[in-house]
Amino acid sequence: MKGLPAVWMHAGDELYATLRGPGKDMTVLATAHSAITNKGTGRDEPMLMVLSYGKGRIFHTTMGHDIPALSCVGFITTFQRGTEWAATGKVTQKVPADFPSADTVSSRTE
C-alpha cells in the first residue's frame, strides 16, 4: 500500500460482505464501506488483504467483477503490485499518475 492514497474511489463493483473464515494470518490492507442504505452491513469490509501459507505469500482482492471494475486504475495497480509482492516479496512498480483520488474514479479503456 506504500505510495497509495489513504482514500480512493473504485469503479462500480460488487462488494462482498461478511467474508467467511477465521481470518488467521491475514492482514487487511484496504476496506470499503458497506452502506446500510444499499442493503449493506454498515461495516467496513475487506477489499485487499495478504495472507501467509507456510512460507508462501498470498495477495487477495475482492475487486474486479466486470469490465468497469477491471478497467479501474486502482484495481489494475493494486492487482499488479499485489501479485509482484506475492511472487517476489517486494514491490518495485510505481503508483501511476492517473491513480484514483478520494473524489474521482480513474479508468483505462485500453
Name every feature range the model reports, one short phrase each.
Residues 1-54, 95-96:
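Catalytic beta-strand/loop cores that center a nucleophilic Ser/Cys/Thr
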Residues 35-46, 51-110:
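Extracellular ligand-binding/catalytic regions of CAZymes and related secreted enzymes
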